[in-house]
Swiss-Prot record:
Keywords on record: Cytoplasm, FAD, Flavoprotein, NAD, Oxidoreductase
Organism lineage: Bacteria, Pseudomonadati, Pseudomonadota, Gammaproteobacteria, Enterobacterales
Family classification: Belongs to the FAD-dependent oxidoreductase family.
Pfam families: Pyr_redox_2, Rbx_binding
Protein name: Nitric oxide reductase FlRd-NAD(+) reductase
Pathway annotation from the record: Nitrogen metabolism; nitric oxide reduction
Annotated InterPro entries: FAD-bd_OxRdtase (IPR050260), FAD/NAD-bd_sf (IPR036188), FAD/NAD-binding_dom (IPR023753), NO_rdtase_NorW (IPR023961), Rbx-bd (IPR041364)
Species assigned in the record: Citrobacter koseri (strain ATCC BAA-895 / CDC 4225-83 / SGSC4696)
Catalysed transformations (reactions): 2 reduced [nitric oxide reductase rubredoxin domain] + NAD(+) + H(+) = 2 oxidized [nitric oxide reductase rubredoxin domain] + NADH
Gene: norW
Length: 377
């Protein structure tokens, strides 16, 4: 008797997989299990909730019940999976268990909170649930410290500034977006943030947080202090691998999978932010969409290896939006930057004269797709 496909998780990756499976098979048994409410929301919207005065509930697009009815699923929200018996093909919660033919881990990633004194005072904005827990504090806060100047930190800094709040952003790198691009490319956005009033503390390190009568005191290196009303950790994500580890699967940074999204167990797969595909963790929407499409075929008996083309990453900073693609983080590229009032085009060229990466901003973003076609796959 068929036990069907069980998916652990209910985020973007899980939903994309369900939709792709149902395009090909309307009847295969599908079960989704997740610790949250399983309501659908658009996670990138979290970068703009403050300036748009949105509450957590405003983000909901579709209830779990509507999703289950539309796609003929069994849903188990607010359910923590405690163990996976890979050999027996069983997943277990505290009081239930489910058998599976194929299991998909779509457990996502959790926000990394720096291990400093007072770390419990830091907020994270990695889910609708996390925003719901702190939305009143963030709405009322006038002074905000953002720890981390990467993609999410830069988006949040601009959003809070647009909402009229006093924003300080701290990062130990010498420039924002340091893991994505060199400083000569990110400087245009960095200057815009500064012009808007964001106080950038680069080459700086947070050492501790302490509650005071009037807010939160952040202690930095070089005997500096700043007092704020809220502190947000935007220091990256860590793939959720605990369940996979307990199941005996191979783990590195994420749950290791091959080009078929298959883990070290032949009937267990991983998808989305938790997955490490052939050594790469790709926590962006487009690779997740493509991965879900290929995995659906493979779960239903196909044999389709994932092929990822060069893809755009969008940085949603409305006052100066950016699109980037290729190996922008490579340190051996020679960057050719054309910056004008209407926008910037930065091309990363290797020693053989080939385009390997690009970053475009503002009105020059319309050139992104033509540039994308010239990148190596």
């Amino acid at each position: 008797m068929s036990r069907g496909i069980v998916i652990i998780g209910s985020g973007f990756a899980a939903r994309q997989l369900v939709k792709n499976i149902r395009k090909q098979d309307a009847t295969v048994a599908l079960t989704l299990i997740a610790a949250d409410s399983m309501d659908e929301y658009n996670k990138p919207d979290l970068s703009h909730v403050i300036s748009q005065a949105q509450r957590a509930d405003d983000l909901t697009r579709q209830s779990a019940g509507e999703f289950a009815e539309q796609f003929n699923l069994r849903l188990f929200p607010h359910t923590w999976i405690t163990d996976i018996d890979a050999d027996a093909h069983v997943v277990k919660s505290q009081d239930k268990q489910w058998q599976f033919d194929k299991l998909v881990l779509a457990t996502g990633a959790s926000a990394f909170v720096p291990p400093v004194a007072g770390r419990e005072l830091m907020l994270t904005l990695n889910s609708q649930q996390e925003y719901r827990a702190c939305e009143t504090q963030l709405r009322d806060a006038q002074r905000v410290l953002i720890v981390g100047g990467g993609l999410i930190g830069s988006e949040l800094a601009m959003d809070f500034c647009r909402a009229g709040k006093a924003v300080t952003l701290i990062d130990n790198a010498a420039s924002i977006l340091a893991s994505l691009m060199p400083p000569e490319v990110s400087s245009r956005l960095q200057h815009r943030l500064t012009d808007m009033g964001v106080h950038l503390l680069l080459k700086s390190q947070l050492q501790g947080l302490e509650k005071t009568a009037t807010g939160i005191r952040a202690t930095l290196d070089r005997d500096r202090q700043v007092e704020v009303d809220a502190v947000i950790a935007a220091t990256g994500l860590r793939p959720e691998t605990a369940l996979a580890r307990r199941a005996g699967l191979t783990i590195n940074r994420g749950v290791c999978v091959d080009s078929y999204l298959q883990t070290s167990h032949p009937d267990i797969y991983a998808l989305g932010d938790c997955a490490e595909i052939n050594g790469q963790v790709l926590p962006f929407l487009q690779p997740i969409q493509l991965s879900a499409m290929y995995l659906a075929k493979n779960l239903l008996g196909g044999n389709a290896p994932l092929k990822l083309p060069a893809m755009l990453v969008k940085i949603k900073t409305p006052e100066l939006p950016l699109h980037l693609a290729g190996e922008t983080q490579r340190c051996d590229l020679n960057w050719h930057i054309a910056a004008e009032s209407e926008g910037m085009v930065a091309r990363g060229i290797n020693t053989e004269g080939q385009l390997c990466a690009f970053v475009v901003s503002e009105d020059r973003m319309k050139e992104a797709f033509a540039l994308l076609k010239t990148l190596p796959a």
